[in-house]
Amino acid sequence: MRLILLGAPGAGKGTQANFIKEKFGIPQISTGDMLRAAVKAGTPLGVEAKGYMDAGKLVPDALIIGLVKERLKEADCANGYLFDGFPRTIAQADAMKEAGVAIDYVLEIDVPFSEIIERMSGRRTHPASGRTYHVKFNPPKVEGKDDVTGEPLIQRDDDKEETVKKRLEVYEAQTKPLITYYGDWAKRGEENGLKAPQYRKISGLGTVEEIRERAFDALK
């Protein structure tokens, strides 16, 4: 099972990635984790990547793809892998294809933006303990106060409505075109000797368990 998980920030990809990982016994490959590991290990690609990161520059796609190919040679990828947060752009998807990185499924978790804004902007956090609440779905007993300590809850900057909207705008511009990219490739079939992935779209609305069952059904 070789899989790419797509969906907007706040669509619940992380939760479903954990279920898929456990069910199929495959590692979740995050480019952020991969970069940090390569830098820490001091591999040639890691040293090169560190130069860009230290200068506050984006690590070029060619270097990321090199790291991906190295990672996929490891023993835990023998039964497959799950890409989380990669590719983010058409250029990265093209680079993956040119590098011959095989993908069986592209699974999109679809949640309307209005729902994502409500989900994320309604989150409240108790900073000291990390306890989280939601003004609508999981409210504290006393509005704005932590259930255990009675201390004030905060809204993290990441969860503020304007921040969420900005993240969704970036997703719309950069990552959403991948949905069309993979959908079209699935229709065209094999290209350059690389089998086209099957494209599946599920609704990300409902309970965590309902979405999990939809995901498993889509990957049969």
UniProtKB/Swiss-Prot annotation:
Monomer. GO terms for biological process: AMP salvage. It is found in: Cytoplasm. It catalyses: AMP + ATP = 2 ADP. The keyword Nucleotide-binding applies. AMP binds at T31, R36, K57, L58, V59, G85, F86, P87, R88, Q92, R156, R167. Pfam families: ADK, ADK_lid. One of its GO terms (molecular function) is adenylate kinase activity. Residues 122-159 are annotated as: LID. Belongs to the adenylate kinase family. Pathway: Purine metabolism; AMP biosynthesis via salvage pathway; AMP from ADP: step 1/1. InterPro entries: Adenyl_kin_sub, Adenylat/UMP-CMP_kin, Adenylat_kinase_CS, Adenylate_kinase_lid-dom, P-loop_NTPase. Its EC number is 2.7.4.3. One of its GO terms (cellular component) is cytoplasm. ATP binds at G10, A11, G12, K13, G14, T15, R123, T132, Y133, G206. Its main location: cytoplasm. Keywords: ATP-binding, Cytoplasm, Kinase, Nucleotide biosynthesis, Nucleotide-binding, Transferase. It comes from Burkholderia multivorans (strain ATCC 17616 / 249). This is Adenylate kinase. Residues 30-59 are annotated as: NMP. Consists of three domains, a large central CORE domain and two small peripheral domains, NMPbind and LID, which undergo movements during catalysis. The LID domain closes over the site of phosphoryl transfer upon ATP binding. Assembling and dissambling the active center during each catalytic cycle provides an effective means to prevent ATP hydrolysis.
